[in-house]
């Protein structure tokens, strides 16, 4: 069987700043990547339909003016939403990280069984402490329908945001939970729920929610940055872990496998 190498459209422009590391993550997972400015899509120089995965990276699109991810989402709504809807209906994948999650939230891409694409069901509000949070956290994969997170339990990832507090109303929360659309929740290093406790839950997210997906499991967004934490050397405790491993005659693996697995799962989706 010939292995399919999916092509990833890594969105760029107007303050997005995580294109390179995001493209690198997909390349390490076995995909081909193109970093494409949104204006090239609007001008027709590149087409969403030519790709299998659309990636909305992190950053500060439009400087978070009018709210994080809002202006970039409006540019897509006004120019590319028909193309995006066609892409979704074709059964392909979309991933958004941090600002990308905020863009996708504003676009209304996390459809419930009771809603259509384009209907916004949640928000990502200012952190409870009204501070920009830049730290490492633990997140736990729930029993979800998300295709990106199979085989992952607890993983260690960095966050970097000022508006990452997930919020939805109680009715929406219960529908997300019942349909297994709550993908990642903040937790401690053992996988125990954060229960809103800072800094385990770094932003005050409702029900500790760090990431959700749409009703199909093919569209996924999260606030933490797995693409920034592929390598073990990036962890803040790396030198300590390295010394302990050395004394025990062990070697630290090159990759934080759970974080790389998110991108591998996307590639493997097209090889089932």
UniProtKB/Swiss-Prot annotation:
<keyword id="KW-0963">Cytoplasm</keyword>
<comment type="pathway">
    <text>Purine metabolism; IMP biosynthesis via de novo pathway; 5-amino-1-(5-phospho-D-ribosyl)imidazole from N(2)-formyl-N(1)-(5-phospho-D-ribosyl)glycinamide: step 1/2.</text>
</comment>
<feature type="active site">
    <location>
        <position position="225"/>
    </location>
</feature>
<keyword id="KW-0658">Purine biosynthesis</keyword>
<dbReference type="GO" id="GO:0005524">
    <property type="term" value="F:ATP binding"/>
</dbReference>
<keyword id="KW-0436">Ligase</keyword>
<keyword id="KW-0547">Nucleotide-binding</keyword>
<protein>
    <recommendedName>
        <fullName>Phosphoribosylformylglycinamidine synthase subunit PurQ</fullName>
        <ecNumber>6.3.5.3</ecNumber>
        <ecNumber>3.5.1.2</ecNumber>
    </recommendedName>
</protein>
<dbReference type="GO" id="GO:0006189">
    <property type="term" value="P:'de novo' IMP biosynthetic process"/>
</dbReference>
<comment type="subunit">
    <text>Part of the FGAM synthase complex composed of 1 PurL, 1 PurQ and 2 PurS subunits.</text>
</comment>
<dbReference type="InterPro" id="IPR029062">
    <property type="entry name" value="Class_I_gatase-like"/>
</dbReference>
<feature type="active site">
    <location>
        <position position="235"/>
    </location>
</feature>
<dbReference type="GO" id="GO:0004642">
    <property type="term" value="F:phosphoribosylformylglycinamidine synthase activity"/>
</dbReference>
<keyword id="KW-0315">Glutamine amidotransferase</keyword>
<dbReference type="GO" id="GO:0005737">
    <property type="term" value="C:cytoplasm"/>
</dbReference>
<feature type="active site">
    <location>
        <position position="227"/>
    </location>
</feature>
<dbReference type="GO" id="GO:0004359">
    <property type="term" value="F:glutaminase activity"/>
</dbReference>
<keyword id="KW-0378">Hydrolase</keyword>
<dbReference type="InterPro" id="IPR010075">
    <property type="entry name" value="PRibForGlyAmidine_synth_PurQ"/>
</dbReference>
<comment type="function">
    <text>Part of the phosphoribosylformylglycinamidine synthase complex involved in the purines biosynthetic pathway. Catalyzes the ATP-dependent conversion of formylglycinamide ribonucleotide (FGAR) and glutamine to yield formylglycinamidine ribonucleotide (FGAM) and glutamate. The FGAM synthase complex is composed of three subunits. PurQ produces an ammonia molecule by converting glutamine to glutamate. PurL transfers the ammonia molecule to FGAR to form FGAM in an ATP-dependent manner.</text>
</comment>
<feature type="active site" description="Nucleophile">
    <location>
        <position position="98"/>
    </location>
</feature>
<feature type="domain" description="Glutamine amidotransferase type-1">
    <location>
        <begin position="8"/>
        <end position="272"/>
    </location>
</feature>
<dbReference type="Pfam" id="PF13507">
    <property type="entry name" value="GATase_5"/>
</dbReference>
<keyword id="KW-0067">ATP-binding</keyword>
């Amino acid at each position: 069987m010939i292995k399919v190498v999916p092509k990833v459209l890594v969105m760029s422009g107007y303050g997005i700043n995580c294109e390179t590391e995001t493209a690198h993550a997909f390349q390490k997972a076995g995909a081909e990547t193109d970093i494409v400015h949104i204006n090239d899509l609007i001008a027709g120089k590149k087409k969403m339909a030519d790709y299998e995965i659309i990636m909305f990276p992190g950053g500060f699109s439009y400087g978070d003016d009018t709210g994080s991810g809002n202006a970039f989402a409006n540019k897509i709504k006004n120019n590319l939403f028909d193309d995006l809807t066609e892409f979704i209906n074709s059964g392909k994948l979309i991933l958004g990280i941090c600002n990308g999650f905020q863009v996708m939230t504003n676009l209304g891409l996390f459809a419930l069984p009771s809603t259509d694409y384009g209907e916004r069901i949640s928000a990502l509000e200012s952190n409870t402490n009204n501070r920009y949070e830049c730290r490492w956290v633990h997140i736990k994969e729930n029993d979800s329908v998300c295709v990106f997170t199979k085989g992952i339990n607890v993983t260690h990832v960095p966050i970097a945001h000022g508006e990452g507090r997930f919020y939805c109303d109680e009715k929406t929360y219960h529908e997300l939970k019942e349909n297994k659309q709550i993908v990642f929740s903040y937790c401690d290093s053992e996988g125990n729920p954060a229960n809103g406790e800072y800094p385990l839950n770094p932003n005050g997210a409702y029900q500790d929610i760090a990431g959700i997906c749409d009703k199909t499991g093919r569209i996924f967004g999260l606030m933490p940055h797995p693409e920034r934490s592929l390598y073990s050397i990036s962890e803040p405790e790396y030198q300590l872990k390295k010394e302990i491993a050395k004394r025990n005659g062990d070697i630290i693996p090159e990759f934080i496998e759970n974080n790389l697995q998110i991108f591998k799962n996307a590639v493997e989706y097209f090889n089932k």
